[in-house]
Amino acid sequence: MRRRLAGCLATAQMASCLFPPNLSDGPTNLPLAEDIEKNPTVFGELLRGEAPIRKLHECEAYLSFRNVKNYAPLAGLVIPKRRRPQDPDGLRKVDVSLLEDMRRVALEVCQREQPEAFAANDYWLRFHRRPWHSVDHLHLHVLAPASKVSSWTAFIFLAGSPWSLDADALLEKLRRSRE
């Protein structure tokens, strides 16, 4: 066991060794209300109204709210109400419409909350990769203005790093994929 763990930690595949994908973690066939009721994450608590929230947007399928961590003047999150694991690398071509919708909500929030940053393209839309996330429910970070973030925030949201993925890059990759 010790040798296997050391091997996992020594490779670029650390996340998949420590947190293998759960093949049952795709969208459920449960009614949305039941899916929300069974959601064990803090986002499930927010969706059920069990914890305070500063909503930025809500519609039938998505919720956007302010992050409790103030990474930027606008530090928002966009989540699908139906729980999906926080595994952007595990998403497939069939998930393009989900990501397009999440991106659209994030851009609407950015345009409303930080219009100057939006007009100047001074914003980031990022996913954290496994295992570098704190809530295992798919969520997209919207940060604006990006020019105002700290150097630490810039590091933890560095697009293309082993821990962070740009939403547009992910969408482009999925659109080009064959599966």
Language model segments and positions:
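HIT superfamily nucleotide-processing domains
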Residues: 2-179
